[in-house]
Amino acid sequence: MLNHKVSVIVPVYNSEVYLPMCIESILAQSYKNIEIILIDDGSRDNSLEICKRYANVDNRIKVIHQENKGVSAARNVGIDASEGEYITFVDSDDELLTNGIFLLVKDIEDFDADIATASKIYV
């Protein structure tokens, strides 16, 4: 049954140009049982403010700010903060297809898999 909570972890560093598109694409997912964890990795632009603005209007969004430690450290912080049964990573300049998370969860459950991945699409 497709109802497992998915933690969407997004490391953020100086992504103000692409970040709104990324967050909007996650919020538009057809699979709604998600939490979005935005880890600002010491951005010097307006990325942290953008993260906070979205968190103020959707309680599924958590914002964590840390000094710059790199993308791997940011992902690890996101894992530690996650509450979902499944975890997926999205880069802050990515845009997801509306059914992207649904398809990953469906494949995990249909095939009793431990992991699912998705391909990149360049437009």
Name the predicted role of every residue range.
Residues 1-123:
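Nucleotide-sugar donor-binding/catalytic module of glycosyltransferases
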